[in-house]
């Protein structure tokens, strides 16, 4: 509704410039603001009521995450970091029209060191995938 109002007044919505900068910096295939994406990223696994994100960005590298955060700061916009959205504490629920930075495409297990008992994973790795990678090791 706000976007339509801005268009009727022949003005740009504040998210337009942010959206353009993100498309330029991380690629238009990694940035969305359509209704389906907004609905998908409006909730996590908690019972908290959802919020509607302004722009959804799905970076694939650390450098792209940095670009997303810088763009949010330049445009004075808040952002919500989001993994797979399975959290039960409401940490990925967007409030007050923020930008969502989704790490679901950053889902690599970088290193598993059984001797030192650690795993180095990207933020989009879900617990089930790590459990599968550890199968038979005595860890889960």
Model-derived features with residue positions:
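Noncatalytic alpha-helical scaffold of FAD-dependent oxidoreductases
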Residues: 1-140
